[in-house]
């Protein structure tokens, strides 16, 4: 069975990308209902969509104005496909603008809305079935609809938005001015589920077993009888990729585990024992720590660190691949969140990712990225579906650049050791407290800041270590974890007493946004 035939058997809802930083959340929410969903460029044609054969289309939000000269548009024939369409924020304005309505700066129609607002439903609608007549939603728009196209009618408004929800049931076109994909829209999940199940007719039978079948077929068709190299870090993402690839192509896969000197405590030996021993992956271990640390000496800028590490990573692969024959592909554990934070065609780059933006232009391999449509929690579910043990699947996320981006400023062996040892203590105590499944991610950072302290009878002037612990569902947004004070106290006491050159511990209580998870 080909990949296309597998895809045709799977119901899917396509999200067209108009530039919102969080439009991937739309696809993520829809997948929660057992419906496959993915992002496509707004430039896609009606014919291309017809070939994909979705049961529904969502037009995402975005930062532009639909009446601007550089506005992102849509193939008008998409409206004639007979496929249900939901426009969100910019998407609703685009439907209105293209079908004969009017969109103006919000000041001419009421006020701009940024933050939670109360939606007042004026009519019943399939889209809002089971939700209250008044509900809190997240608004974020500088433009507003003042006239709706022929055939549409008002469903809901807010105090500052005359048309907050509209629909044309005859043509299966729906528009909402707010963002149901974010948690601040209290009934947002219900609205998206109504669209997927009630309006689009989704069965809700998408699962990780479907994904495994589809990806294995895709990998086999892409690779054929050629060979693949996988950069194995020992983290969840690359480990899951390794097991998936081995299931697809067996001994055509060679894993290269690069010890760049930026790993967590004892991580190298753990990787070899777990994946090389238990799963039988063919792993070549390369000690390239001196190469990386020499290149990173005196480099303070985090983007330069990422680029240097990304480039050198591939050059190490080139060196190893030259010793092998017939290697054409490089596999990576790139996730959906990596792609959006590195910027899409329509979205601004937040930070370059090692798996996305750190690759040299003269790279000698074709890329295979089996996880690039998945979020972190879906990767864990995939690992379980592949039969991987929980100690691997629930391993703490670890960035490709390793501890390099958990040391602020220039990297030294001394700084690396403070992070390596303090991180080990943090992970040990979180596990002892039974919190390792409740906290999404937790690690320590050498802030690069030194402060005065007193230890024993002497004055110290040593490093400040920050603890970062977050809770999240999908990694796109996050809150700081409210760890028990007694646990934090024990962690702090142990780090200061057991780790050399550290005399102060601080706790990062910043959410994402405005911060990112990693400090660099």
From Swiss-Prot:
Which pathway or pathways does this protein act in? Purine metabolism; GMP biosynthesis; GMP from XMP (L-Gln route): step 1/1
Provide this UniProt record's keywords sorted from A to Z: ATP-binding, Glutamine amidotransferase, GMP biosynthesis, Ligase, Nucleotide-binding, Purine biosynthesis
Q: Name one GO cellular component term.
A: cytosol
Q: Which GO terms describe its molecular function?
A: ATP binding; GMP synthase activity
Q: What is its EC number?
A: 6.3.5.2
Q: Which Pfam families match?
A: GATase (PF00117), GMP_synt_C (PF00958), NAD_synthase (PF02540)
Q: Does the keyword ATP-binding apply?
A: yes
Query: What does the record give as the active site?
Result: 89 (nucleophile), 179, 181
Domain (Glutamine amidotransferase type-1): residue spans on this chain: 12-205
**Domain of life according to the entry:** Bacteria
Q: Does the keyword ATP-binding apply?
A: yes
The kind of enzyme this is, by top-level EC class, is ligase
Please give the PROSITE patterns that the UniProt record associates with this protein: GATASE_TYPE_1, GMPS_ATP_PPASE
Function noted in UniProt: Catalyzes the synthesis of GMP from XMP.
**NCBIfam families linked:** guaA_Cterm, guaA_Nterm, PRK00074.1
Q: How does it assemble?
A: Homodimer.
Name of protein: GMP synthase [glutamine-hydrolyzing]
Q: Which organism is it from?
A: Streptococcus pyogenes serotype M3 (strain ATCC BAA-595 / MGAS315)
Lineage of the organism = Bacteria, Bacillati, Bacillota, Bacilli, Lactobacillales
């Amino acid at each position: 069975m080909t990949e296309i035939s597998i895809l045709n058997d799977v119901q899917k809802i396509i999200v067209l990308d108009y530039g919102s930083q969080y439009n991937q959340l739309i696809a993520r929410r829809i997948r929660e209902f057992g419906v496959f969903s993915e992002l496509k460029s707004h430039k896609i044609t009606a014919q291309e969509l017809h070939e994909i054969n979705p049961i529904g289309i969502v037009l995402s939000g975005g930062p532009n104005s639909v009446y601007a000269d550089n506005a992102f548009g849509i193939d008008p024939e998409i409206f004639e496909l007979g496929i249900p369409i939901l426009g969100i924020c910019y998407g609703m304005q685009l439907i209105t603008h293209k079908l004969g309505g009017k969109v103006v700066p919000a000041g001419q129609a009421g006020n701009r809305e940024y933050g939670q607002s109360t939606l007042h439903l004026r009519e019943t609608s399939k889209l809002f079935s089971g939700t209250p007549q008044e509900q809190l939603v997240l608004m974020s728009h500088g433009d507003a609809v003042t006239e709706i196209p022929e055939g549409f009618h008002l469903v809901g408004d807010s105090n500052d938005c005359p048309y907050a929800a509209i629909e044309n049931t005859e043509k299966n076109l729906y528009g909402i001015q707010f963002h149901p994909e974010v948690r601040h829209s209290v009934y947002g999940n219900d609205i998206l589920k109504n669209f997927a199940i009630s309006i689009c007719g989704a069965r809700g039978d998408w699962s990780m077993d479907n994904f495994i079948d589809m990806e294995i077929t895709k990998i086999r068709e892409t690779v054929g009888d050629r060979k693949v190299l996988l950069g194995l870090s020992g983290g969840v993402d690359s480990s899951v990729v390794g097991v998936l690839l081995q299931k697809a192509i067996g001994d055509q896969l060679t894993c290269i585990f690069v010890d760049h000197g930026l790993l967590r405590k004892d991580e190298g030996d753990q990787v070899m024992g777990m994946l090389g021993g238990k799963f039988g992956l063919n792993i070549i271990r390369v000690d390239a720590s001196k190469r990386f640390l020499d290149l990173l000496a005196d480099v303070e800028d985090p983007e330069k660190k990422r680029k240097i590490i990304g480039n050198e990573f591939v050059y190490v692969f080139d060196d190893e691949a030259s010793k092998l024959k017939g290697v054409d592909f490089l596999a990576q554990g790139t996730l959906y969140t990596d792609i959006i934070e590195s910027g899409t065609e329509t979205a601004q780059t937040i930070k370059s990712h090692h798996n996305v933006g750190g690759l040299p232009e003269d790279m000698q391999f074709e890329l295979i990225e089996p996880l690039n449509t998945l979020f972190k929690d879906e990767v864990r579910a995939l690992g379980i579906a592949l039969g991987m043990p929980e100690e691997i699947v629930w391993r703490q996320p670890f960035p490709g650049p390793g501890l390099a981006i958990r040391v602020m400023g220039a990297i030294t062996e001394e700084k690396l050791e403070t992070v390596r040892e303090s991180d080990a203590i943090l992970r040990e105590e979180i596990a002892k407290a039974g919190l390792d499944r409740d906290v999404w991610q937790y690690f320590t950072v050498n802030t690069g800041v030194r402060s005065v302290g007193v230890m024993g009878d002497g004055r110290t002037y040593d490093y400040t270590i920050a603890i970062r612990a977050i809770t999240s569902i999908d990694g796109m947004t996050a809150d700081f974890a409210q760890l028990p004070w007694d646990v934090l106290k024990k962690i702090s006491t142990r780090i200061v007493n057991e780790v050399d050159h550290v005399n102060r511990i601080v706790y990062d209580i910043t959410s994402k946004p405005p911060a990112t998870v990693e400090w660099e």
